[in-house]
Amino acid sequence: MIINFPTKDHWRSASRLDYVIKGLDWFADNYNKLNIESVAFPPLGCGNGGLEWTTVGPITYRKLKDLPIEVEIYAPFSATRKEISVDFLENSVIKTSNVKGYKLGSYNKYWNLLLYSIQQLNNDRYSLHVGRTIYQKICYILTAVGIPTGFVFSKSEYGPFSPEAKNALLILANNNLINEETKGKMIEINVSESFVLDKNAFSSDDFEKVNKALDLFYRFKNTESAEIIASILFASSELKNSGSVNADKLMHYLQEWKPRWNNDECRNLLMEYSIELASMKWLSLSN
């Protein structure tokens, strides 16, 4: 038996949390009349509906956990381990009034170059494989070299961050183009085996930019080095908008942005990376 849960007014609209709650309440009141002995629930209203699992998950769990039937609740691929734990689902504080999902955007064909880059890195045994932190760095650098991803970046604790890039993960997942797999302590983002890049859809200039970015990605030793590289490039770009960039300005910007880097050891490390990036023509430092 399949039970339809309307979560929105129109298929193109964002989902409404109150519809999800009404549907769950209806199910709790009527499952016995339908002779249901076991049931599986998807993450209602998440995905294209735009509701957050951090709200939907706890509500679904609390509405269904005491029913005397077998219940399975599936989380979206983007949910973290913490967000699927019993402690989180039982105890997190949630807002339930006037909650409406955000509308996921449309698919950007240049994200195929992002998928291609992730695919290349994950298929290279010597490269750092792609998790959520590295994903943001890849998105930033591809955008920085001129790939029109549509992502806008700003400063965050671990380097440049884009809400649009995070949103793109949901769109890619909804199109069955990526999935996540737990490998040790890391959650790896994998490109679906069915994905094959149509190289005829892109120019030689596009591939030149992607290959330049890939050459840099292959140099990521760990998430820390990826953070340093992306942060230096972001800082250089921001400073360049207001004039020339020299080492002192760059160090001041980075250490003001991230106080944990405000020590001699980190400054020396940042300088090493900056000089190497300058030698690779990724940035230009004036005297």
Name each model-derived stretch.
Residues N4, E72, L233:
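Residues in well-ordered beta-strands of folded domains
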